[in-house]
Design a protein with these regions (language model features):
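Flexible, glycine/threonine-enriched loop-and-boundary segments that flank and lead into catalytic domains
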Residues: 1-4, 50-52, 156, 160-189, ...
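Signature of N6-adenine DNA methyltransferases within the class I
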Residues: 1-174, 199, 209, 214-218, ...
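Proline-centric
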Residues: 7-12, 253-264, 275-323, 332-365, ...
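A generic secondary-structure signal for well-formed alpha-helical elements
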Residues: 11, 15, 24-25, 38-46, ...
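Secondary-structure capping and boundary motifs in well-ordered enzyme cores
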Residues: 23-26, 30, 58, 222, ...
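Short coil/turn segments at secondary-structure boundaries
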Residues: 138-154, 170-172, 199-203, 279-286, ...
Length: 654
């Protein structure tokens, strides 16, 4: 910075000065003085904006710019070459694109002062520059940086970690909340680049807000109010999400507040092609600051445009919410989209559907095809709505020559159907039914803490002892594979059971019969999928003896009781050990009387069982040690803390 400011002192009058630096001085608020000194006292003749990956190694991640200026004040246009888009897979194109005149821009540096802070936006057209005559968005809405707790591990939880009866949902005023009963409040914390609705993942312990680094106590008037939130890491796009209220907000999930009608106009603008133009210019780093958004010019729509925008926004938010709630990480998740509701099932049983539908009802493939079409329709409708909104805002800002309304598939942030993912999530839902988290008889969460209500379960009764073994053979009647087969039969009917199991197995992939494929999935892949869905904060805990699969069992964290390990040891670990002893005895007899070729196969089985028996023997000692401690857990402490209490007997979180 010192050298940039002093550069004219090192040059003769009318002499030329050149630099190669990063581009931060051109845009960031902290460099305003640098820009003012340079733009007022020097005449820029050329700029080459290389973007990232000009150099090899770590320095290649930095956006590089080269420029030449003259120690004079001349009223002439500078020439700039913009190569920022030629990166990643297009890096090799930088050289040739330097000579492509479509990448050339010509600008008067005096025009940069049209924008507060004078960012060097050499590629802005006159129309974009003129738009800065409009007031900033900060005059239209209250845009607020979020709070910092100072210790997220202590004060934040994923909502799935807690007792759901202790979360204060849908509150509009903090005074409505008894923090001794419901200390946890939903919390915006950014997340993936998702538009319109979603990323409802965290809750904050508001009963401890007095310990936060910065609780934004001067902003109490916007606590829990409807807003728009976004992720501060935006890259080359911007994604606003509508919130109906009931949330606190993090510095990573800052918010804009206004009346509801204004919020709808604002989120339409945020998620249009207009906002990224300004965000990129006002702060080209990957982090979007509150101050940058406040400076974006706000051009008000006319009455007709206003009504059209609100209609489109309402529909698009609703569609996005429907998609978000179709996955189990949403607290408004009702049931898996491939599972018929209890009402549909009753109608089916009383023959209220057409004959053709009744024939298809028991086939998972039919439900998947319906879901696939629903996803496709939703995706296409959101894209159509976004293109209509783009048309409106492009017209409002007069940027028809700059932008097209077209939206690419990659920019639509709802998910399409995916057979493998959706079958794996169906299995996860089934496991939830086995534990009582979900029920086929009620929509939504049946149990996630609080009081157990047995009346919610009639079609499938949850596992009574909260321990479901995962075996590589039929050792237990309530083994997870057997339970899953029974679940599929109950949901879709016995007539289509084998067909449905094959459909599931084909989606999972693998060798063997459908039941073998499903069993192998539970043994090898289910828990990895679970950790991914729940972001390494599992609600089903895998008790695991090790690599030989001597013993595996799932436990639902919200139903954990202090005597669980003692029951697991006597009812499952000891039972498994006895089965190994019995099998090994039978194998020894069989080997003695087997032919040479059979003996090879049987000996291999014997070795596997011996290794499993040895592994479970060592595991039993660890379980015994912990069982004697009669450990209790508090869900408020979070998965990270509670899981560690049983680290010696649980699968590693990877």
């Amino acid at each position: 910075v010192m050298y940039i400011c002093a550069q004219r002192n090192f040059s003769k009058k009318n002499g030329f000065i050149s630099f190669i630096t990063t581009n931060s001085w051109m845009y960031l608020k902290s460099f305003v003085k640098v820009r003012e000194i340079s733009l007022k006292n020097l005449s820029f003749t050329s700029i080459v904006d290389y973007g990232t990956e000009l150099f090899e190694g770590k320095i290649g991640h930095l956006p590089i710019i080269a420029w030449v200026s003259q120690n004079a004040t001349l009223n002439r246009k500078l020439t700039a070459v913009r190569l920022v888009d030629f990166r990643y897979g297009r890096r090799a194109e930088k050289h040739d694109e330097y000579f492509n005149h479509s990448n050339y821009y010509y600008a008067r540096q005096a025009d940069f002062f049209e924008i507060d802070g004078a960012p060097v936006v050499y590629w802005f057209s006159s129309k974009v520059l003129e738009s800065f005559e409009y007031p900033g968005i900060g005059t239209f809405a209250e845009i607020v940086s979020g709070m910092t707790t100072g210790d997220n591990d202590k004060f934040l939880r994923q909502w799935t970690e807690t007792d759901i009866s202790r979360i204060a949902f849908d509150k509009t005023d903090v005074s409505q909340i008894d923090l001794s009963i419901t200390p946890w409040i939903p919390y915006h914390k950014g997340g993936e680049q998702r538009k319109w609705y979603g990323n409802h993942e965290y809750v904050v312990n508001w009963s401890a807000s007095g310990q936060f680094n910065r609780a934004k106590t001067t902003m109490t008037h916007v606590y829990l109010k409807p807003c728009i939130t976004w992720s501060d890491i935006s890259g080359n796009s911007f994604a606003g999400r509508y919130c109906f209220g009931g949330f606190m907000f993090d510095v990573k999930g800052s918010c804009a507040f206004a009346d509801i009608n204004k919020l709808k106009i604002l989120i339409g603008l945020f998620n249009s092609k207009i906002t990224p133009i300004y965000v990129e210019a006002l702060n080209p780093t990957s982090t979007t600051q509150v101050g940058d958004l406040k400076r974006i010019p706000y051009a008000a729509p006319n009455t007709e445009q206003n009504e059209k925008i609100k209609t489109l926004v309402d529909e698009t938010v609703s569609l996005s919410k429907g998609e978000w709630d179709s996955f189990e990480f949403s607290w408004d998740y009702n049931r898996h989209p491939l599972v018929p509701s209890s009402t549909e099932k009753k109608e089916q049983e009383t023959s209220q559907f057409s004959h053709s539908r009744m024939e298809k009802f028991g086939h998972i493939v039919w439900h998947y095809e319906k879901w696939q079409q629903e996803c496709e329709d939703r995706f296409n409708q959101i894209r159509t709505n976004e293109e209509e909104l783009n048309c409106i805002y492009i017209d409002i800002y007069g940027l028809q020559d700059e932008l097209t309304p077209d939206v690419e598939d990659k920019d639509v942030t709802v998910r399409k159907a995916d057979l493998e993912r959706d079958i794996r999530s169906l299995i996860s839902y089934a496991v939830g039914c086995m534990f009582g988290r979900y029920s086929l008889d009620v929509d939504g969460l049946a149990y996630a803490g609080g009081e157990w209500d047995a009346s919610k379960y009639s079609t499938i009764i949850p596992d009574k002892d909260n321990i479901i073994p995962i075996c590589d053979d039929d050792y237990f009647d309530d083994d997870i594979t057997g339970r899953f087969v029974k679940w599929v039969e109950t949901v879709y009917g016995s007539d289509t059971l084998e067909e449905n199991l094959k459909f599931i197995a084909d989606a999972l992939g693998g060798k063997g019969t459908p039941r073998e494929v499903i069993r192998n999935y539970f043994i090898n892949d289910f828990y990895a999928d679970h950790l991914k869905i729940y972001q390494k904060r599992p609600i089903y805990w895998l008790f695991d003896s090790g690599k030989k699969n001597g013993f595996k069992a799932l436990v639902y964290m919200h139903r954990y009781q202090s005597d669980l390990l003692a029951r697991m040891r006597t009812d499952y670990v000891h039972e498994q050990q006895e089965r190994y002893r019995t099998q090994l005895s039978h194998l020894a007899d069989a080997i003695d009387h087997a032919s040479a070729s059979e003996r090879v196969k049987l000996t291999k089985q014997q070795k596997k069982l011996q290794e499993q028996a040895l592994e479970i023997q060592k595991y039993e000692e660890k379980v015994h040690h912990l069982a004697d401690q009669n450990i209790s857990i508090d869900l408020d402490d979070g998965v990270k803390h509670n899981y560690e209490l049983f680290a010696d007997v649980l699968a590693k979180i990877k």
